[in-house]
Design a protein with these regions (language model features):
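N-terminal-proximal low-complexity accessory segments that begin disordered
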Residues: 1-46
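Conserved N-proximal alpha/beta basic substrate-recognition cap immediately N-terminal to
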Residues: 28-40, 49-164
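ATP-grasp fold ATP-binding core
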Residues: 137, 166-187, 206-219, 299, ...
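Glycine-rich phosphate-binding loop of ATP-grasp-fold ATP-dependent ligases
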Residues: 152-155, 172-197, 224, 248-264
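Phosphate-binding site of ATP-dependent enzymes
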Residues: 170, 196-251, 302-306, 310-317
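A long amphipathic alpha-helix within ATP-dependent nucleotide-binding catalytic cores
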Residues: 208, 237, 250-312, 352-370
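ATP-dependent carboxylate/phosphate-activation module, predominantly the ATP-grasp catalytic core
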Residues: 227-283, 321-346
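C-terminal active-site "lid" helix and adjoining low-complexity regulatory extension at the edge
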Residues: 309-314, 322-371
Length: 371
């Protein structure tokens, strides 16, 4: 049996690096409203931690044709939980950080048996930094992809180096080493920062030790590859994620068979190159993850327009997400060959809502399918 937890504030918790951490309102609301979603990848009879059991059951009811029968529990339920079969019990959060560990231990000290050590959490945090992917993954993927790939990222520890790198790039993307989707990222069309941007970047350097500076590419298409790292360090490729974002914030995913997604992706990327990159990711990260990280993760990529307008280049590592992703959720909702393609979207009005639409009723911008 597993206890599943949707803790979307994970990326911000990594930046804070504290046991006692209060997430921003949006992160807390997302967790409250969508805490039920592990039901879609959990196994029959697993537990899912939520803030409100009745609300989770009601939200789940609207999507009852998808997912498994699970048991929704609250932190109050965990306080009285008796561990009868510790050999088979596991805790599976969206992402591991010091905060979620402390929350579980405050609920029930017996969870200590299933918690990663503080050293392991520190290692996971370091590998979750954008600096890790920029230095240990992206260069090797570029080397393997040769002239068919683009992508570079520089970790800058002073504003002098930030300005030098921006001047070299012309147009840049500045990213906090740790931040959540859409946050901690600035797109800059100029070769030098204005006063506001310089103040923001200097603050990131002060708080996190440095900042990532990357060229701003002419992106044509977003996609990702989803993986799972096993206990022995071996890594399995789980599938392709075709998704849409706006301003760096997640909008939704295409739900389709792997064959259909490959056909869509083939319009913008060399599938043989994508397959080769996938193999290299498994081989490169296996050595880093073995004995440290077990669980789901994903690598976001993008197709970039060539400067001469003739085709596309592959950026093989825009982000390494060392946690479960919305792409993994989309894979859990993959339709059969006989079922129609669908769109999974996350939207916010008075609350966060997850919806699944047939493509004929696509409420997302159609750029999720074609640019």
């Amino acid at each position: 049996m597993k206890l599943h937890i949707f803790n979307p504030e994970h990326d911000i918790a990594l930046a804070a690096n504290q046991e006692r951490f209060t997430a921003p309102h949006a992160g807390r609301r997302l967790r409250t409203d969508l805490g039920f979603i592990p039901a879609f990848w959990a196994s029959e009879g697993d537990m899912v931690l939520v803030d409100d059991v009745e609300a989770a059951i009601e939200a789940r009811r609207h999507l009852s044709k998808f997912g498994k029968d699970v048991v929704f529990v609250t932190y109050a339920d965990l306080k009285a939980f008796a561990f009868e079969d510790v050999e088979s019990f596991q805790v599976d959060p969206w992402g591991w950080d010091r905060t979620i560990k402390e929350q579980l231990l405050r609920a029930n000290s017996d969870f200590q048996l299933f918690m990663p050590s503080d050293d392991t959490l520190a290692a996971i945090r370091e590998m979750s930094s954008r600096r890790f992917a920029a230095e240990h993954l992206l260069p090797l993927l570029r080397e393997a992809g040769e002239e068919k790939t683009v992508g570079e990222a520089r970790y800058c520890t002073t504003m002098e180096v930030v300005k030098q790198t921006m001047a070299q790039n012309g147009k840049s993307v500045l990213k906090s080493p740790w931040s959540s989707s859409g946050r901690g990222v600035r797109y800059v069309e100029t070769a030098a920062p204005d006063a506001h941007l310089e103040g923001w970047a200097a603050n990131v350097v002060k708080r996190q030790g440095g900042i990532m500076v990357e060229p701003l590419y002419n992106k044509v298409y977003d996609f990702g590859l989803e993986f799972f790292c096993n206990a022995d360090g071996t890594i399995d490729f789980k599938g392709i994620s075709l998704f849409a974002t706006r301003g760096g914030a997640y909008l939704g995913n295409i739900l389709a068979t792997e064959a259909d997604k490959r056909e869509m992706l083939s319009r913008y990327a060399d599938l043989a190159l994508v397959d080769s990159v996938s193999e290299h990711i498994c081989n490169i990260l296996s050595a880093h993850f073995k004995g440290v990280y077990e669980g789901a993760f994903g690598v976001d990529m993008m197709a970039v327009a060539r400067e001469d307008g003739d085709g596309f280049m592959l950026h093989p590592c825009v982000e390494l997400n060392l946690r479960r992703t919305m792409g993994h959720l989309a894979l859990a909702l993959t339709p059969t060959i006989a079922e129609p393609q669908r769109i999974m979207s996350i939207s916010y009005a008075d609350k966060y809502r997850m919806r699944i639409h047939d493509t004929a009723k696509n409420l997302l911008n159609t750029s999720i399918v074609t640019p």
